[in-house]
Amino acid sequence: MSSMAGDLGFIGVSTQHSLIQKLFPLWVDVLGLGEAKLRGFDHPPGVSLADMRLQVEQLRGDSSLAGALVTTHKVVVWECAKGLFSESDSHAQRLHEVSCISRNSEGELVAHAKDPLTARWAINQIVSPEHWQRFPEAEVLILGAGGAGLALAWVLLDSNEKPARIHLTEVEAGRGSQVRDHLKEFSQELWSLHEINSPEEADLILAKLPPQSLIVNASGLGKDRPGSPLSTSADFPSECHIWEFNYRGSLEFLHQALRQQRKQRLHIHDGWEYFLAGWAYIIAEVYHFELTEPLFAKLREAALPLRPIH
């Protein structure tokens, strides 16, 4: 790859505190991206549409930026700047969000929503598609119906091999209509939205899951905010697969599962590989290379010294 690859923008809230600041230089060496740097652009939650549009306009006009990754402000970028993109992929159009900004051969901006791609890759590392054939009664509980949780639900529903049912929980009042709109193409015999007010209500859904089900913390709790979407009294069903989307933070949900791992014979996964894949797919899009399994293995190996220990 070219030593003139350009820098990668990072549009977030507190970009200097992200582990990617240490990881990106290691990956630049693996990928042969020369002098490419990571440049953070911080905006508070609730940033105005005008300010974010100005940010995207600045990115468009700065030819030294090859593209950008967007974290917290995915929906805002779409709302304020969709007219600034010469192209938008099908996921960005469907989800009305942007997690990756690249440039085409003319230098024009292209919008991508990469969460579905990352979710599809990650879920196949945790449970194989054959899992739902082997355990046809197994279900999925996604605790949190935000962007990442919704992307996972969509990927599972869009697959040839599906769980018996997918449950999504949502505590944010008024978000239910958005969730239903995103999943409207799928039969409601396959999924349920539970609009809940407390962790104890989530416990009740958890208690009814069959063995070999998948339980996912997509709530954001345990990362930037302490807590778990389940109460401290929650009991995981036996032989379930537990997926904590987060890889850092207080990780209460993960520790709940670890305490029950031996007794309930749980299969537990944190969000480390999901984090790596999310960044790797976006870097591949921005710098226009194919992310093969052997290449991802090299990136995973380079990142290993930075992995937090739980």
What is the predicted function of each stretch?
Residues 38, 163-167, 240:
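Short beta-strand element of Class I
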Residues 72-73, 217-221, 246-247:
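Short glycine-/small-residue-rich Rossmann-like dinucleotide-binding loops
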Residues 60, 175, 199-230:
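Rossmann-like NAD(P)-binding element
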Residues 100-103, 222-295:
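Rossmann-fold NAD(P)-binding glycine/threonine-rich loop
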